[in-house]
Structure formats: C-alpha cells, structure tokens
Amino acid sequence: MLGAGGGAGRAIAWQCALERCERLVLANRTLAKAKELERELARYFAGPRLLGPVAQLETIPWEESALRFQLSQIDLVVNATPLGMNQTDPSPIPISLLAPHLMIFDAIYKSVTTPLLRATADAGARGANGLAMLLHQGALAFEIWFNRPAPIAEMRQALVEG
C-alpha cells in the first residue's frame, strides 16, 4: 500500500508498476488524485490475476475503515505523504491499525524517527526511514554530475551526523 499523491509517491508507484509488482494499493486523502494515478498505471496491471479475485491495482481513500481492511491484507506500507515532516505531526496511520506482520517504509528523511516509525515500533512491526532513498538519489546525482563513483560511505556519514 502506498500513501501517494506527491512526487515521491508517484515515482514509487511508477517503479512498482514498471517492476510488475503483484499488487499495488494507492491511498490518498484526495481520492481523485489517486484515481488519476491509477488510470496512468492501469496498463501495467492488466495481465492475468495472480491473486484470484483480489484487485492488482486499487485506489482507496485515506480513511481509517479503508486502511483497516487493506492493512490486514498487505505486507508493505510506503508513506510518501508529508505527515511526519514535523515531530508534532500525528502518525498518518493510527497505531491501532499497525500489526507485527507489516513492514513500514517512511519516505521522510528529515528525521531518523518519525511519528509513524515510533508507532511502527510500538506495534512490533518493522520500519525504515527515507535516509537510504535520499543517500542513493544523491549518489546517482553525484555520479551524473562528476562522472565518477560517489563516495557513499562519506555521504552516509554526513547524513547520519547531519
């Protein structure tokens, strides 16, 4: 399940489609935005159904009842919403909906531990922040600009200390 709508969410959704992921659930507070992205991606999910009657590509509103059902059916949640940029933000997913079987990736890289990642740990689930994504985006940009391998270890250290 992907909380998508902005640039990072769209990029992650497109990569999921290009990699032919088995199932993608797009969740957004503005359902029309998610539906538009669903239409763009639909051709990548038009093949045979591997999961029986379960939709391979689905759009849901970012509402507790819709999230509750989906979270019981999936393994990976990607938060690409801005919720969590500030430490005072609430978790975009209520802790009562999180379960140990979930892996949560919070694309936010502003802080090591976001409200969602704290809730994830409290629920006994696994989580990761967006620092690795930021690191490898920066490394790729470095290699394009300077035409040499990026100093990944030094870049990682700067991010962690930074």
Q: In which residue ranges do the predicted regions lie?
A:
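Glycine-rich adenosine-cofactor-binding loop
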Residues: 1-17
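NAD(P)-binding Rossmann-fold cofactor-contacting core
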Residues: 19-50
